[in-house]
């Protein structure tokens, strides 16, 4: 569960290291982002040589959350950190690599992110 004003790590090589969530997209009543949800975020920490600079406002998709994500078979998955992958306007990832595992729940909507990830849980 990622709320507004939460901080999240960036799981790609776009140049950003940490972002702050400004808004959760998906309707005015949606207050919490789960795995696979798109958020609007501001880059808080970035590498000086990266494609993304600190202060930029971008869209990102949530790929890992600390909160349990329950699956239909009764099991759940939980990660060590909250992480996002930064997206371009057309919905493709900015980076060319995805670090760390990503959840299986994003397979249908974001196949490009799953293909870049080393591990899908």
Swiss-Prot record:
Q: Which GO terms describe its biological process?
A: translation
- Please name one Pfam family that this protein belongs to: Ribosomal_L14
Organism superkingdom: Bacteria
Q: Which InterPro entries match?
A: Ribosomal_uL14, Ribosomal_uL14_bac-type, Ribosomal_uL14_CS, Ribosomal_uL14_sf
Its keywords, alphabetically, are: Ribonucleoprotein, Ribosomal protein, RNA-binding, rRNA-binding
- Which Gene3D superfamilies would you find in this protein's record? Ribosomal protein L14
Output the Gene Ontology terms for molecular function.
large ribosomal subunit rRNA binding; structural constituent of ribosome
A Gene Ontology term for the protein's cellular component = cytosolic large ribosomal subunit
Please give the PANTHER family that the UniProt record associates with this protein.
50S/60S RIBOSOMAL PROTEIN L14/L23, LARGE RIBOSOMAL SUBUNIT PROTEIN UL14M
What role does it play? Answer: Binds to 23S rRNA. Forms part of two intersubunit bridges in the 70S ribosome.
The entry assigns this protein to a family as follows:
Belongs to the universal ribosomal protein uL14 family.
**Subunit composition?**
Part of the 50S ribosomal subunit. Forms a cluster with proteins L3 and L19. In the 70S ribosome, L14 and L19 interact and together make contacts with the 16S rRNA in bridges B5 and B8.
This chain belongs to the protein called Large ribosomal subunit protein uL14
Origin organism of this chain? Answer: Mycoplasmopsis synoviae (strain 53) (Mycoplasma synoviae)
């Amino acid at each position: 569960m990622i709320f507004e004003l939460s901080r999240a790590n960036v799981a790609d090589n776009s140049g950003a290291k940490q972002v702050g969530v400004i808004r959760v997209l998906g309707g005015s009543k949606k207050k919490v982002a789960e795995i696979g949800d798109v958020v609007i975020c501001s880059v808080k920490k970035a590498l000086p040589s990266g494609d993304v600079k600190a202060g930029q406002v971008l869209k990102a998709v949530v790929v890992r959350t600390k909160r349990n994500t329950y699956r239909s078979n009764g099991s759940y998955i939980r990660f060590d950190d909250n992480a996002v992958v930064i997206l371009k306007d057309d919905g493709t990832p900015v980076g060319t690599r995805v670090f760390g595992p990503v959840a299986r729940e994003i397979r249908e909507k974001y196949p490009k992110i799953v293909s870049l990830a080393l591990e899908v849980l």
